[in-house]
């Protein structure tokens, strides 16, 4: 216990006791001010109750002065103890007074009928002060009234009656046995620490966070997909990725740019009987063949090859120029032809049918590559390969150079042995993903995602298609938890999974820093409507963008509030005051209130339900999660957090 907390607990108690002990006898001094017998009697009785009333007033003043303090609960306990002591002093004094003539009381009357009314009044005041102090000690700053307009519901709600989803209803919607952690079932804005800023290194600012029941999603309604928006440093990994990785029981694919999640949850998932694989460029010996799923489970090889080529080639959700479209489309066709030659022509051994071989065949000098294309056209056993190669056999050198440069640029990351090893290995196969027992953590850092986005697209796309081609024939569901998903760029396969993934056992949980990231990736303002329409739930937290705050405010709806108006008029004959009430429209939450939300608070939208305002499930606040989590390689660099947590 710190010195401040000791002072907050001891000082009000000592002050209240001191006043209760020092003021008795003041009734004679007060009575001397009376001019008549009645006045002296009244002032004397006021003096009898004054020590206890003054003690109660001191306690209340102390609580009001400490309002907003981190240790307000400690002050509440101190005032409650002081009130108890004052009541005890009053009872002892009155008991001693009554004991002096207890033997003279008639048998028909009770000794309690002689209790002094003034003392009873003072004691009752101290009792009420103690009850309020106990309320403060239990719920902290939430015990004080909040300044907000009176909301109107029912027939008088002319401007709307939007309201927050009630927590019991939220508990039914997001049952605790679900696998995707959405948040915690408590209202941060009504918590004891609502007036304080959230600090991860100060447990006294956490309030009910970490002690409340979880809100979890089981994929039972909607598309089963979720989208999370939280700014940089907004505890995305802490409150979404790690808790979900601890709780999800099925196949889990995590895009982990910080390589932070896998070391923390790997041991827990292995204990749960899961096979955990970490794809890390620093360990290229662990990898899979990104082409091993082609043509399996009813899919055509030609379509699957075209899909792989499209992941390697970067694509934008926005319209581009005709020249750019031509060279991109031609480069895509050339890459498709080379991949098809490796997989379909029949001259490449099965074990060598990898993207590394594709890059080796493609990265030849132009004259040699043109000769290879002619040879492929003449000798390939596949009509599909011949038809795709035919366009390049007699292409003019200038045009072919542009197409060749485009294809080389998009596949240059395959020249890095550590990157090529991840998608050309044999440690596991994509069939393992669909078996329902394997988890994969894709630990590509932000620099790699920014420079070589095709690598992540190939990995995620291969896993998605391996499940998609099975037509839903897999145990349970596979969760693709994609942190920093904007770094993947535009992926049409994600749009396919968004629209039809539920049928095939695919659930997406995508984490963005802002709505702007989504719009930039998927093509302007229409992107939000496409993705929001297909999401079962959408979470917003740690918002710093006024435009996003305005969107949240509008989506939450409006309420009807009652406003008191007072008008005064002054005339020669006197003055008058008129008081009236009127109804006005007010947003359920205003944009500036969204921007001022605590970092551990979020707003969750679901289709057909009121917006949910709740807490966030940060793993370091929950004892059940802390016991399962391994070491975080970043916490040692953050100072107080790893000492307090």
Protein language model regions, located:
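P-loop NTPase motor domains
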Residues: 209-210, 217-223, 227-506, 584, ...
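Low-complexity, polar-biased intrinsically disordered regions enriched in Pro/Ser/Thr/Gly
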Residues: 189-215, 317-326, 347-348, 563-582
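Short alpha-helical interface patches
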Residues: 132-181, 186-193, 304, 310-312, ...
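Conserved ATP-driven motor cores of ASCE-family P-loop NTPases powering translocation/secretion/packaging/pilus
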Residues: 82-85, 498-500, 504-603
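Basic- and hydrophobic-enriched, low-structure N-terminal and domain-boundary segments
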Residues: 2-14, 18-241, 582, 644
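Glycine-centered flexibility motif
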Residues: 131, 183, 346, 456, ...
């Amino acid at each position: 216990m710190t010195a401040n907390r000791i002072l907050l607990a001891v000082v009000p108690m000592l002050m209240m006791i001191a006043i209760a002990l020092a003021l008795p006898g003041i009734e004679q001094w007060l009575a001397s001010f009376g001019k008549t017998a009645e006045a002296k009697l009244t002032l004397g009785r006021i003096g009898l109750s004054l020590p206890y009333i003054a003690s109660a007033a001191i306690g209340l003043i102390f609580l009001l002065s400490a309002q907003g303090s981190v240790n307000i609960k400690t002050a509440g306990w101190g005032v409650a103890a002081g009130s108890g002591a004052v009541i005890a002093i009053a009872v002892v004094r009155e008991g001693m007074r009554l004991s002096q003539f207890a033997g003279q009381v008639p048998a028909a009357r009770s000794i309690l009928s002689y209790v002094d009314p003034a003392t009873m009044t003072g004691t009752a005041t101290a009792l009420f002060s103690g009850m309020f102090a106990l309320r403060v000690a239990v719920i902290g700053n939430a015990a004080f009234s909040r300044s907000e307009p009176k909301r109107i519901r029912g027939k008088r709600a002319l401007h709307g009656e939007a309201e927050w989803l009630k927590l019991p209803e939220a508990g039914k919607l997001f049952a605790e046995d679900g696998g995707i952690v959405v948040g915690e079932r408590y209202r941060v804005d009504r918590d004891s620490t609502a007036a304080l800023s959230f600090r991860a290194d100060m447990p006294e600012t956490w309030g009910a966070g970490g002690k409340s029941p979880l809100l979890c999603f089981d994929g039972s309604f909607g598309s089963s997909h979720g989208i999370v928006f939280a700014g940089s440093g907004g505890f995305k990994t802490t409150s979404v990725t790690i808790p979900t990785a601890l709780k999800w029981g099925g196949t889990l694919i995590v895009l982990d740019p910080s390589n932070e999640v896998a070391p923390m949850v790997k041991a827990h998932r292995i204990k749960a009987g899961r096979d955990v694989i970490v794809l890390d460029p620093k360990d290229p010996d662990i990898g899979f063949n990104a082409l091993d799923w082609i043509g399996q489970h009813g899919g055509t090889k030609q379509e699957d090859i075209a899909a792989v080529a499209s992941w390697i080639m970067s694509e934008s959700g926005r319209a581009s120029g005709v020249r750019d479209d031509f060279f991109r489309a031609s480069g895509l066709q050339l890459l498709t032809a080379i991949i098809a030659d490796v997989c379909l022509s029949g001259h490449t051994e099965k074990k060598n049918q990898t993207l590394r071989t594709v890059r080796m065949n493609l990265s030849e000098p132009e004259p040699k590559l043109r000769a290879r294309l002619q040879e492929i056209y003449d000798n390939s056993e596949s009509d599909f390969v011949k038809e795709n190669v035919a366009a390049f056999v007699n292409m003019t050198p200038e045009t072919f150079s542009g197409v060749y440069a485009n294809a080389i640029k998009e596949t240059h990351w395959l020249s890095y042995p550590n990157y090529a090893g991840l998608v050309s290995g044999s440690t596991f196969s994509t069939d393992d993903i669909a078996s329902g027992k394997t988890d994969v953590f894709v630990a590509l850092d932000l620099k790699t995602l920014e420079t070589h986005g095709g690598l992540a697209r190939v990995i995620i796309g291969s896993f998605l298609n391996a499940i998609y081609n099975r037509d839903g024939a897999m145990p349970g569901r596979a969760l693709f938890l994609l942190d920093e998903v904007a770094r993947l760029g535009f992926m049409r396969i994600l749009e396919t999974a968004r629209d039809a993934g539920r049928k095939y056992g695919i659930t997406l949980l995508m984490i963005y820093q802002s709505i702007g990231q989504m719009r930039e990736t998927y093509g302007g303002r229409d992107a939000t409507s496409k993705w929001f329409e297909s999401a079962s739930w959408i979470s917003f937290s740690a918002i710093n963008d006024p435009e996003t705050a305005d969107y949240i405010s509008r989506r939450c709806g409006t309420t009807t509030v009652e406003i008191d108006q007072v008008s005064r008029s002054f005339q020669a004959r006197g003055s008058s005051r008129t008081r009236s009430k009127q109804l006005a429209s007010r947003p359920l939450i205003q944009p500036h209130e969204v921007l001022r939300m605590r970092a551990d608070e979020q707003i969750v939208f679901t289709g057909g339900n009121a917006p949910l305002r709740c807490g966030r499930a940060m793993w370091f606040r929950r004892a059940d999660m802390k016991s399962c989590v391994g070491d975080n390689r970043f916490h040692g660099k953050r100072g107080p957090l790893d000492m307090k947590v």
